[in-house]
Amino acid sequence: MRFFGKFIKRNYDPKTDSDVLFSLSSAYLTLESKIGLKNSGRCALSLKSISGMYFNEMKEDIKRFLDISKTDFELAYRTVTDSYGYLWVILEGKRMEDLLAGISAVGDTIDEKGFSNQLLAAVFEFTNDRNKKQYLIYNYKRNSFYPFVPVDGSQKTRNTEEEMKMMATIGDEVPLEKDMTLWYPLWDLPL
């Protein structure tokens, strides 16, 4: 199917979501060594909830998978529905590789069940030396990452200087969204 997809789709991109997500497996080390950002051990996947039996079955499949694979990936998980109606699957683990495998598998399950259009983002949390949170967000629709650094205690203000620093640091390692107007802020993240 992928072969014919090259001819049918105008914007064919051979990289799957999993390929792009796993590009973070080395980039997180660069963030730590060059600008001191450490993986917090938390990430989340967000998707728009819809009512219906098949969506509920998909949620149960995700929970079953995560329950079974807890020991393999050394992950804890929880789900939260936010005030906008988005379902968040939140993963916690010590190793970035486990987080990436878990979030990729959850995304693949959603895709296999036919709900890929509901996917919003995968969010990876980092902390700096002052324990301030910074995020790298993967936009499923754009197949790219972008930084998000909220300013603590402010009324929804971003630290664009820190965002640009993150982008410059890993720009050669992961596909980054070049159009900054598409760097959507995700306020009040449930991480």
Q: Where do the language-model regions lie?
A:
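Extracellular/secreted glycoprotein ectodomains characterized by long, lumenal stretches
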Residues: 69, 95-107, 114-117, 144-145
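Short, flexible loop/turn elements at secondary-structure junctions
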Residues: 51, 93-95, 142
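Generic detector of well-ordered alpha-helical segments enriched in charged/polar residues
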Residues: 5, 19-22, 56-63, 100, ...
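Charge-rich, low-complexity segments
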Residues: 1-56, 148, 156-191
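Extracellular-facing segments of soluble proteins and assemblies that are Gly/Ser/Thr-biased and enriched
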Residues: 77-108
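A glycine-rich, hydrophobic loop/mini-helix early in the fold
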Residues: 33-88
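Helix-rich interaction surfaces within compact, conserved domain-sized segments
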Residues: 111-185
